[in-house]
Swiss-Prot record:
<comment type="subunit">
    <text>Forms a cylindrical channel with 15 subunits; approximately 25% of the particles have 16-subunit channels. Closed pentadeacameric channels are 180 Angstroms long and 145 Angstroms in diameter. Each subunit turns in a clock-wise manner around the channel.</text>
</comment>
<dbReference type="Pfam" id="PF00263">
    <property type="entry name" value="Secretin"/>
</dbReference>
<dbReference type="InterPro" id="IPR038591">
    <property type="entry name" value="NolW-like_sf"/>
</dbReference>
<dbReference type="GO" id="GO:0009279">
    <property type="term" value="C:cell outer membrane"/>
</dbReference>
<keyword id="KW-0812">Transmembrane</keyword>
<keyword id="KW-0653">Protein transport</keyword>
<dbReference type="InterPro" id="IPR005644">
    <property type="entry name" value="NolW-like"/>
</dbReference>
<dbReference type="GO" id="GO:0015627">
    <property type="term" value="C:type II protein secretion system complex"/>
</dbReference>
<feature type="signal peptide">
    <location>
        <begin position="1"/>
        <end position="23"/>
    </location>
</feature>
<keyword id="KW-1134">Transmembrane beta strand</keyword>
<protein>
    <recommendedName>
        <fullName>Putative secretin GspD</fullName>
    </recommendedName>
</protein>
<dbReference type="GO" id="GO:0042802">
    <property type="term" value="F:identical protein binding"/>
</dbReference>
<keyword id="KW-0472">Membrane</keyword>
<dbReference type="InterPro" id="IPR049371">
    <property type="entry name" value="GspD-like_N0"/>
</dbReference>
<keyword id="KW-0998">Cell outer membrane</keyword>
<keyword id="KW-0732">Signal</keyword>
<dbReference type="InterPro" id="IPR050810">
    <property type="entry name" value="Bact_Secretion_Sys_Channel"/>
</dbReference>
C-alpha cells in the first residue's frame, strides 16, 4: 500500500510539472484521477511556493481532467475552483499562509481583509468592510443576502452604529455586491422645500402630517427613504419639507386644502354645566384663552390673528351655562378644559366627638374666737368674719330683727355653708363649715357635610349678655352697654380630598359654656375649649385632634401660731380649706368621603334611623305620664323607603 501511494504521488508530481522551462512563463496542466485531496493540496503548494495548512476535517479524493494549460495565477484559481466543487475553501492568513477548511466553517472564519486596491479575484475568500453614506445599512443588508447564491460561501452583516456592511465570501461574488452597493448608495432626489402658512398653525399641521406619514408606514411598510420629513418653524409659521419629489408634491397638495381661512359662522357655542358654577369658570377660561392667544399669536400672520382676538366668554346664571364665541381650534381646547372642570366634586361628612369629664370636691372648716377684753381670732377668707357676725347679732338683739341696714346682711346673703356659734357676755365663738362636690360630664358630637375644598361651619349655642360698659348721665341715670357672646358648640372645617382615600382637614373647634360656680360681680365667667389645626386622615378612620388631662389640688391652712400646732386642740385655732379637681378633655374627628348618591343616601338613612329610634324611646317612656304621648311629633318611618325622584332633563 505504501508503495502504491508513492507511485501515485510521483504520478501527480509528473502531471503537475510545468510545461515550459521559464518560471515566469510556467504553464501548468491538471489531470487527477481518484487522487488523495491532502496530497493534492501539498503538491499544489509546492508548485505555487505557498505554505498551505490543511484542516483535519479535510478528507477524501478528487478527480479532475483539463485539456488546457494554466498560468500560475490561473492555476491558483483553478485550484480554488476544484476545492469549491468538493466543499472546501481556502483562507488567506495574515502571515501569507493558506488554510484549507470546510466551506461550512467559512462564516466563522473571516477571509483576507480586502479593499479597493486589493479586492481579490475569482474564488478567493475575502472580507470587505463597506461604509455607507446615504443608505441605512440595516435596510440594505437583507437585500444583499438575497443576491448571494443559496449554497455559496459567505455572509452579509451590518453594524448600525457606524452604518457599515461586512461582506464575507468569494471575491467574485463580493466584487459583484460592491458594484450593486455603489449604484444604490447614492444621494437621492431629496430636496428641501419651505412652505409659508397663511392661516393654519405650523406646529399643528406638522403634528397632523407626521402622524399621517407614520400611519402609512405601518400599513404599507413604505421605506422611510421614500417618505417626506416635515419640521415646523414656529418663528415664521412655516413648514420645512424634505424628501423625494413625489412625496413633497403629495404634502404640498394636502397643505392647500388645510391652510384655509376658518369660517366665522357657527363659532358660538353654549355649554350647559352639570356641577360647576358658570360664573366661577368664566375667569378660569378667560385665562386659558389668553394663554392660547400668547402661544399662537406670534406664529400667525396679522391677517389671521383677528380670530384669536375675538374670544368672548359669558356666563348665564339662570341656566348655569357658558356662552363662548371663538374660532374652532380655541373652541375645542376650551371644551376640553370645561369637560375636566365640570365634574362631580366629592363631598365629605365630618363628625367630631368632644368628651369632657370633670370631678371636684372641697372642704372649708374653721373656728373663730372673740373676747371684748383680750381680742379675737378671726379668719376673713371664711367669708364670714366673727367681728361682723358679732355686730350683726348685737343689732339683731337690739332691734329684734335683721334688715338691709344690718352690717351682717350682705355677708349672710352671700355666704354658702354652715355657720354656728354663740355670743354671750365677753365671749363669742363662730364655727363655719362647707363641703362641696362638683361633677360635670360633657359629650358633644357635631357633624357636618360639605363639598371638597369648601368651608363649612356649624354653630349651636346661646347668646349671653355681657356688661361691657356703664355710664351715669346728668340725671343720675345709669346707662349700661351690653355685648352678647355666643357660647355653645362651634365647628368650622375645610376638607380637601387627596389622591386615594386621604382627606386633609383644616379644623376650628370650640366648645364654650358659662361657669355657674363663679360668683364674680364683674360678669359671667366663660369656660372655653378651642382647638385649631390641620390633619391628614384616611376616610372612615377616627383620629384624635388633641386633649387635656388636668389634675388640680390645693390646700390652704390659716392658724394661730403655736396654738394651732397643738394636736387635737389646735383644730380650734385654725382654718383649713382643701380643694381638688380632675378634668379629662379629648377631641376626636372622623371624615367620610361621599363620592356618589348611594353612599350619601346610606349615611343619611343611618343617622335618620338612629335619631328616630331615640325619639321613639322618649315617647314610649312618657306613655304612662298624665299627658298622653299619642299627639307628640315623630319622624316619618318611610322617609328613606320611597324612591328618589327622577332627575329632570334639560
Amino acid at each position: 500500500m505504501k508503495g502504491l501511494n508513492k507511485i501515485t504521488c510521483c504520478l501527480l508530481a509528473a502531471l503537475l510539472m510545468p510545461c515550459a522551462g521559464h518560471a515566469e512563463n510556467e504553464q501548468y496542466g491538471a489531470n487527477f484521477n481518484n487522487a488523495d485531496i491532502r496530497q493534492f493540496v501539498e503538491i499544489v503548494g509546492q508548485h505555487l511556493g505557498k505554505t498551505i495548512l490543511i484542516d483535519p476535517s479535510v478528507q477524501g479524493t478528487i478527480s479532475v481532467r483539463s485539456n488546457d494549460t494554466f498560468s500560475q495565477q490561473e492555476y491558483y484559481q483553478f485550484f480554488l475552483s476544484i476545492l469549491d466543487l468538493y466543499g472546501y475553501s481556502v483562507i488567506t492568513l495574515d502571515n501569507g499562509f493558506l488554510k484549507v477548511v470546510r466551506s461550512a466553517n467559512v462564516k466563522t472564519s473571516p477571509g483576507m481583509i480586502a479593499d479597493s486596491s486589493r479586492p481579490g479575484v475569482g474564488d478567493e475568500l475575502v472580507t470587505r468592510i463597506v461604509p455607507l453614506e446615504n443608505v441605512p445599512a440595516r435596510d440594505l443588508a437583507p437585500l444583499l443576502r438575497q443576491m448571494m447564491d443559496a449554497g455559496s460561501v459567505g455572509n452579509v452583516v451590518h453594524y448600525e452604529p457606524s452604518n457599515v456592511l461586512i461582506l464575507t465570501g468569494r471575491a467574485s461574488t463580493i466584487n459583484k455586491l460592491i458594484e450593486v452597493i455603489k449604484r444604490v448608495d447614492v444621494i437621492g432626489t431629496e430636496k428641501q422645500q419651505i412652505i409659508h402658512l397663511e392661516y393654519a398653525s405650523a406646529e399643528d399641521l406638522a403634528e397632523i402630517l407626521n402622524q399621517l406619514i407614520s400611519e402609512s408606514h405601518g400599513k404599507s411598510q413604505m421605506p422611510a427613504l421614500l417618505s417626506a420629513k416635515i419640521v415646523a418653524d414656529k418663528r415664521t409659521n412655516s413648514l420645512i419639507i424634505s424628501g423625494p419629489e413625489k412625496a413633497r408634491q403629495r404634502i404640498t397638495s394636502l397643505l392647500k386644502s388645510l391652510d384655509v381661512e376658518e369660517s366665522e359662522e357657527g363659532n358660538t357655542r353654549v355649554y350647559y354645566l352639570k356641577y360647576a358654577k358658570a360664573t366661577n369658570l368664566v375667569e378660569v377660561l378667560t385665562g386659558v384663552s389668553e394663554k392660547l392667544k400668547d402661544e399662537k399669536g406670534n406664529a400667525r400672520k396679522p391677517s389671521s390673528s383677528g380670530a384669536m382676538d375675538n374670544v368672548a366668554i359669558t356666563a348665564d346664571e339662570q341656566t348655569n351655562s357658558l356662552v363662548i364665541t371663538a374660532d374652532q381650534s380655541v373652541q375645542e381646547k376650551l371644551a376640553t378644559v370645561i369637560a375636566r372642570l365640570d365634574i362631580r366634586r366629592a363631598q365629605v361628612l365630618v363628625e367630631a366627638i368632644i368628651v369632657e369629664v370633670q370631678d371636684g370636691n372641697g372642704l372649708n372648716l374653721g373656728v373663730q374666737w372673740a373676747n371684748k377684753n383680750v381680742g379675737a381670732q378671726q379668719f376673713t377668707n371664711t367669708g364670714l368674719p366673727i367681728f361682723n357676725a358679732a355686730q350683726g347679732v348685737a343689732d339683731y338683739k337690739k332691734n329684734g330683727g335683721i334688715t338691709s341696714a344690718n352690717p351682717a346682711w350682705d355677708m349672710f346673703s352671700a355666704y354658702n355653708g354652715m355657720a354656728a356659734g354663740f355670743f354671750n357676755g365677753d365671749w363669742g365663738v363662730l364655727l363655719t363649715a362647707l363641703a362641696s362636690n362638683n361633677k360635670n360630664d360633657i359629650l358633644a358630637t357635631p357633624s357636618i357635610v360639605t363639598l371638597d375644598n369648601k368651608l363649612a361651619s356649624f354653630n349651636v349655642g346661646q347668646d349671653v349678655p355681657v356688661l361691657s360698659g356703664s355710664q351715669t348721665t346728668s340725671g343720675d341715670n345709669v346707662f349700661n352697654t351690653v355685648e352678647r357672646k355666643t357660647v355653645g358648640t362651634k365647628l368650622k372645617v375645610t376638607p380637601q380630598v387627596n389622591e386615594g382615600d386621604a382627606v386633609l382637614l383644616e379644623i376650628e373647634q370650640e366648645v364654650s359654656s358659662v361657669d355657674s360656680s363663679s360668683n364674680s360681680t364683674l360678669g359671667p365667667t366663660f369656660n372655653t375649649r378651642t382647638i385649631q389645626n390641620a390633619v391628614l386622615v384616611k376616610t372612615g378612620e377616627t383620629v384624635v385632634l388633641g386633649g387635656l388631662l388636668d389634675d388640680f389640688s390645693k390646700e390652704q391652712v390659716s392658724k394661730v401660731p403655736l396654738l394651732g400646732d397643738i394636736p387635737l386642740v389646735g383644730q380650734l385655732f385654725r382654718y383649713t380649706s382643701t380643694e381638688r379637681a380632675k378634668r379629662n378633655l379629648m377631641v376626636f374627628i372622623r371624615p367620610t368621603i361621599i363620592r356618589d348618591d348611594d353612599v350619601y343616601r346610606s349615611l343619611s338613612k343611618e343617622k335618620y334611623t338612629r335619631y328616630r329610634q331615640e325619639q321613639q324611646q322618649r315617647i314610649d317612656g312618657k306613655s304612662k305620664a298624665l299627658v298622653g304621648s299619642e299627639d307628640l311629633p315623630v319622624l316619618d318611618e318611610n322617609t328613606f323607603n320611597s324612591h328618589a325622584p327622577a332627575p329632570s332633563s334639560r
